[in-house]
From Swiss-Prot:
Encoding gene per record: S100a6
Cited PROSITE patterns: EF_HAND_1, EF_HAND_2, S100_CABP
Entry-annotated residues carrying N6-succinyllysine: K47
UniProt-listed Gene3D superfamilies: EF-hand (1.10.238.10)
Positions where Phosphoserine occurs in the chain: S46
Function: May function as calcium sensor and modulator, contributing to cellular calcium signaling. May function by interacting with other proteins, such as TPR-containing proteins, and indirectly play a role in many physiological processes such as the reorganization of the actin cytoskeleton and in cell motility. Binds 2 calcium ions. Calcium binding is cooperative.
The protein, known as: Protein S100-A6
A Pfam family: S_100
Domain (EF-hand) ranges: 12-47, 48-83
Family matches, as PANTHER family: PROTEIN S100-A6, S100 CALCIUM-BINDING PROTEIN
Amino acid sequence: MACPLDQAIGLLVAIFHKYSGKEGDKHTLSKKELKELIQKELTIGSKLQDAEIARLMDDLDRNKDQEVNFQEYVAFLGALALIYNEALK
């Protein structure tokens, strides 16, 4: 049986691949795919406006290829984890 942290990491990977590749490259998230992931998988997603998601996409897309790769996605999750940690203090 997998440990809880192993399961959590597996879930983060599975969610990325659930949305990546719906259009184009199966190893990256397009703006549309990222928007769908955020809106369906995060509580805050339904509260974000299109312009906010576009800004987030621009911030996450470090190599400016108009897509979010797995490394950029993990950086996003790390930033979210820091925010969640601060909220628990």
